[in-house]
Every structure is written in structure tokens, then in C-alpha cells.
Amino acid sequence: MDIKRTVLWVIFFMSAVMLFDNWQRSHGRPSMFFPNVTQTNTASNATNGNGASGASAAAANALPAAATGAAPATTAPAAQAQLVRFSTDVYNGEIDTRGGTLAKLTLTKAGDGKQPDLSVTLFDNAANHTYLARTGLLGGDFPNHNDVYTQAAGPTSLAAGQNTLKLAFESPVKGGVKVVKTYTFTRGSYVIGVDTKIENVGTAPVTPSVYMELVRDNTSVETPMFSHTFLGPAVYTDQKHFQKITFSDIDKNKADYVTSADNGWIAMVQHYFASAWIPQQGAKRDIYVEKIDPTLYRVGVKQPVAAIAPGQSADVSARLFAGPEEERMLEGIAPGLELVKDYGWVTIIAKPLFWLLEKIHGFVGNWGWAIVLLTLLIKAVFFPLSAASYKSMARMKEITPRMQALRERFKSDPQKMNAALMELYKTEKVNPFGGCLPVVIQIPVFISLYWVLLASVEMRGAPWILWIHDLSQRDPYFILPVLMAVSMFVQTKLNPTPPDPVQAKMMMFMPIAFSVMFFFFPAGLVLYYVVNNVLSIAQQYYITRTLGAAAAKKKAS
């Protein structure tokens, strides 16, 4: 029997490992067993002798024939382009005059001596990574992202005392149409105004459409080991609300999303940060998501423009968000935009938990202590359930010697052994599963808190005490993972010893296995689990001691 159980445990363990490896590969992570074929990005960052960026041109050249109604993918003309560098209080970036494309955008957040430099590059057009925001016209041979624009004269930095910075770019005349594209940056804001003025300088009416798209490769962003957050396009409409689209679904032509709307937005989502085009509410638009190169994808909207007579013009305004996934800020920008902060399937529980965590942080001013206090509050709320669980485990621990005696007596007759055990449970009024149900009820809450701490950009660069300077990074000295292992070991000792030796060994092995994982988890997550375990040990010790005192008093009387 022991050999059979050992074999079953080995099969279970290997199955779990293989399932985890398959999960890793399905989410774009390297396999533990099978080597990945290295994919190279076709976009180049070569520059010409005059400082012109060839990256956008290379990306454009890589695009196959576009789907009907999607943005053009014509070969870029030979005209030279250049990069226009700009800076605001929250951004440093580059606009490529080829298409007036936002080709590089760095979110600047300098360190203050106590906290590290938290600057991060979101948009980029390098040899190993492509992520762009671009616009253009459809419906004829009109200016698009392949044409070289001319920068209008003006400042490129947000000066002290200045609240806005405008950068304007003018296209060449194509098809009797000229486009003036204006980016408006506002102090303290991660929302960029993008205005497209379409001038008909020809002799016949034109009916163009404006496309706005985000182009990105499938390069994964750095996340903690054993953790996964969503990376890919997303679409939000009033019809279907938030729809995430994986790169693998696009590869398989299985992308499911609303293709026409007059509301909502489209986005590219990654861990902690996102970008989103937000067209004018009420403006009809078509939505497209597609693969345009072996490792390059795009999500965009195509917005029709009413007929423009010769000598007349039309204006199309939109907003481009590019910044951190700060929930409260996102709620004020556009309906549903806060959903880019990915809580997975536990959103309904995770959002209230983050709200509570945020309120606690408002009082204590430290995210580490906010985690400690929130965990304490959750344990207090669930104390009645935990007490019921610990009481059941304590009663099981009391009758364990008698259970072992029955198993030894009837080891050759499993049917009689089970009947004797059931009679013992009935006599002692013990439910062998009584300790499980209260724990199962609490699991969704603890999983939700896990996702809150994993997905919240507020943890990035947030210190706690002493050696913990960033709750989003692993403990540099592994002190918290060691405390986690010790707390799990203590919990194991407090629980009833399984009668099966194999199960007993597995219970002893679990703290070691989990500790290995927690060595790579963000410090904020490990802090939560350590505090939760310490409080659980204290609760269990208190309840067990109270029950023991009550039993001794009853026996004495």
C-alpha cells in the first residue's frame, strides 16, 4: 500500500511540474525542459547619415498587406526622417518625423536617495524591441505613417511655469490632402492630446478615415519568477466591456473582440503599465487587431471622417494614455480604463481589497505596514471561521492515537476499519472535514490579495523597513522567505500528524518546496504570507490552549 501511494505521489508531482511547464510555455515563458527557438525582431534601429531614424521605416517595410480597412503597410518612401526629442515633467521621448510617430517614450520618476530611479521606457523602436503609437489616413493615397512630416517651429521642453507643451508636425501633400498632427502634453498628466487636422488642398471632395493604432512585438516584460501577468492588446466597449486578446489567439486567428462601436478604447497592456487610444465618445469607429510580422502585432481604430470639400478642413481629436496602471487615476480618464490593471478572475474581490489597502496606506503612509495591517484585519474578520477550523483540527489531534490504533487493528480489513473510524467520529462528535470548509471559504480572499499585491504598481519602489527598499522586488537577503519557511514548518507541527507515513513526509516536504518559490517572489507578497502565517500560528496556539484548558477543567470536575 505504501509503495502504491508513493508511486501516486510521484505521478502527482511530475504531473504538476509538467502542467506548470506547459503553463509557462503557453504564456511566452521559456520551458524548463524544451529549448525555445530564438525569435528576432525584424524592426531595425538603423539610422542614416543625417540622424534620420530608419526604425519606423523598417517596421513599415516588415508589414504585410493590411487587412481590409486597416492601416496601410506600403513601402516607406526614400525621404529622410529625423527624431525630435522632447521632455516634460513626466516624460522624455522621441517623435519620428516619419509619420509623426511616437517612437520612444520614457516615464521619468527619479530617485530621491531613499528610493531608486523608477524611470521606465514604454514606447521604443530598437533592434530588439518595437512598441509604437502612430496615426494616419485611409481611404485614398493620403498621408500615413510612412510619410515624412515636417516639424513646426517651437519649444520641445516643458518650461518651468508652463502647463502645456504642443508639438506640431505637417505632412506633405498627398491625394490633395495635407495633415497637421499636434501632440499636447500637460503638466503632471499621462494623457496626451492628439489632434489631427485634415486640410483638403485639392480640387475634389475627399472622404478619408483616420486610423490610430498601437504596434508592439511580443517581447515579454520582466516579472517575478513563478508569476504571470497579462501582456497583449485589449478592447473596451459598452457592448462587451473589457476584452483581453492574447498574442497566441491572434496567431491562431481566434481573437474575439467587438469590431465596431461608437465608444470605448483600445490598449496594449503589460505588467504595471499600459497605453491606450481613447477616441471621442460617440464617434463611430471600426476596431482591428492583427499580426503584421512574425513577432509584431497591432491594435487600432479606424474612424471615418465626413466629406471635406476643397479648401475646407476637418479636425479629429483623440487622447493617448501612456503611463502606470494607477487605479484611481485610470478611473478618471475613461470608463473602464482601470481594468487594464489585471486582477485576473478575482477582480470582483480584488478591487475592494485594493481600495481598503489604499485607505490604510493613507493613514500609515507606508505600503509595507499597510500590507501588515490589511492582513491583520482580514484575519480578524475570518477569526470565527479560523477558530472553527482550528477546533476541528485540535479535536482530530486528540483522537489521532485512537485512529492509529483502529487502523492497526483492522489493517487487513479496510471495510471494518472505515466503519470503526466512522463510529469513532460519531462518538466523539468530530467531523474529519470540519477543518477544511472554513479554510476553503477563505481561499478566494487570499488569492485576491495575492493578485492585488502582484498587479499594483504602487508596490514598485515602495520601501518597508531596514533592508526592504522595494516591495515589488525579491528580498535581497532572503530573510522573509526564510521566515516564511520557518512559519510553515511550525504550522505543520501544530497540525495533526497524518497517519500515512507518505503523507507525513509530504507535509514535511511542503515548507521546503514552497520556500524555494518564495525566494523569487516580490517582497510585498512574501511579507503578506509571513504575516498571515504568524497570525495563523498565534490563533491556532490560542485556540488549542483554550480548548486544552477547558478539557482539563472538565476532567477535573
Swiss-Prot record:
Disulfide links within the chain: none
Keywords: Cell inner membrane, Cell membrane, Chaperone, Membrane, Protein transport, Transmembrane, Transmembrane helix, Transport
Gene3D superfamilies: 2.70.98.90
Domain of life from the UniProt record: Bacteria
A Gene Ontology term for the protein's cellular component: plasma membrane
Keyword Chaperone in annotation: yes
InterPro entries hit by this protein: Membr_insert_YidC (IPR019998), Membr_insert_YidC_N (IPR028053), YidC/ALB3/OXA1/COX18 (IPR001708), YidC/Oxa/ALB_C (IPR028055), YidC_ALB_C (IPR047196), YidC_periplasmic_sf (IPR038221)
UniProt GO BP: protein insertion into membrane; protein transport
Entry annotated with the keyword Cell membrane: yes
Pfam family, one: YidC_periplas
Positions in coiled-coil regions: none
Membrane topology, record value: Multi-pass membrane protein
Function: Required for the insertion and/or proper folding and/or complex formation of integral membrane proteins into the membrane. Involved in integration of membrane proteins that insert both dependently and independently of the Sec translocase complex, as well as at least some lipoproteins. Aids folding of multispanning membrane proteins.
Family label: Belongs to the OXA1/ALB3/YidC family. Type 1 subfamily.
Protein name: Membrane protein insertase YidC
Annotated organism of origin: Burkholderia thailandensis (strain ATCC 700388 / DSM 13276 / CCUG 48851 / CIP 106301 / E264)
Taxonomic classification: Bacteria, Pseudomonadati, Pseudomonadota, Betaproteobacteria, Burkholderiales
Gene this protein is translated from: yidC
